Regions:
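Aromatic-Pro/Gly-enriched surface loop or interdomain linker
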Residues: 39-102, 261
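Short alpha-beta junction capping motif
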Residues: 51-52, 99-146, 232
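Bacterial N-terminal signal peptides
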Residues: 23-39
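Extracellular ligand-binding/catalytic regions of CAZymes and related secreted enzymes
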Residues: 43-46, 51, 87, 215-222, ...
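Solvent-exposed loop/turn segments at secondary-structure junctions
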Residues: 55-58, 90-92, 111-115, 142-147, ...
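Bacterial N-terminal signal peptides that target proteins for export
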Residues: 3-28
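Catalytic beta-strand/loop cores that center a nucleophilic Ser/Cys/Thr
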Residues: 75-77, 81-82, 158-232, 237
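Hydrophobic, well-structured mid-protein blocks that either form specific transmembrane helices
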Residues: 131, 136-174, 179
Length: 268
């Protein structure tokens, strides 16, 4: 009798185990699928580039401001990126803590209102670049922007500034650099001439060079694209971009901007 009872229990356990195995297998498969979905979502999650400006560009040249023109070019070229425009006149000077925290690359164009940017915001940007690897791209007159000067730690001044009808031939100095991928030499019919030397730290790379031609025919060299690593972050400075010229609508400049964003973005 006892033997029959034990056999019955063994048969019951065996049946339970057989019933449990498919359920456990199904649960395992479901778990793997769920994890894969999460991973795929993370891999496809949009990265974020914020294009900031101060709303001082003439509307006859830039109807949607300079940040709008740059953003338009980036949206056409960057896949898997969220492109956000921000302005000094917005709440939080355009960059809330939440936006800054999710920003992979910050593009900055400023001219007349550098002093209006809060020191608190500058400190937060510096921390995001140096300690957390956010990329920073400074354009033209933003050599005097407070975040850029903070990152460089130097006066960031040029010898002279002349918007006198000077033109420039821009040449690709390093064709193997990610910023110059697909870029050919090109010319701008007008540029505000920034005379060397440029009071910044020695760059890790000069990817674009320029040759100014003054109205009297004289020529003068000038660097157009400079790169640094500052802490954990990458920094790029681009010399063209005067507010009365249509530089940010030009295909060559738009390609450089898109390439620079991808180069400056932290690895994930």
């Amino acid at each position: 009798m006892r033997s029959q009872h034990i056999n019955a229990m063994n048969n019951s356990h065996s049946l339970f185990a057989k019933t449990l195995r498919p359920a456990a297998a199904a649960l395992t498969v479901f778990s793997l699928i769920a994890v894969s979905i999460v991973q795929l979502k993370a891999a496809g999650a949009a990265r974020t580039v914020v294009v900031w400006s101060e709303a001082t560009a003439p509307t006859n040249v830039y109807p949607k401001d300079i940040n709008g023109a740059i953003a338009e070019g980036l949206k056409a070229r960057l896949k898997g990126w969220e492109v956000v425009t921000a302005c000094l006149t917005n709440e939080n000077q355009g960059i809330s803590d939440a936006l800054l925290q999710k920003t992979d690359v910050l593009i900055w164009w400023g001219h007349k209102r550098h002093g209006n940017v809060s020191n608190e915001l500058v400190a937060k940007i510096e921390k995001r670049v140096k300690e957390e690897g956010m990329g920073f791209i400074s354009l033209h007159s933003s050599h005097f922007a407070k975040p850029y000067k903070k990152l460089m730690g130097t006066p960031c001044s040029w010898r002279e500034y002349k918007a006198d009808g000077t033109s420039v031939k821009i040449t690709v100095k390093d064709p193997n650099h990610p910023i110059t991928r697909g870029v050919k030499d090109f010319s701008l019919p007008k540029i505000e001439r920034y005379g060397e030397p440029f009071a910044v730290p020695e760059p890790e790379a000069v990817v674009l060079d320029g040759l100014y031609t003054k109205p009297n025919g004289e020529t003068e060299p000038g660097r157009m694209g400079l790169c640094w690593t500052v802490g954990k972050g990458k920094v790029f400075y681009f010399t063209p971009g005067h507010e009365t010229y249509d530089d940010f609508f030009r295909p060559e400049v738009r390609l450089i901007m898109a390439n620079a964003v991808e180069w400056a973005a932290p690895k994930k």
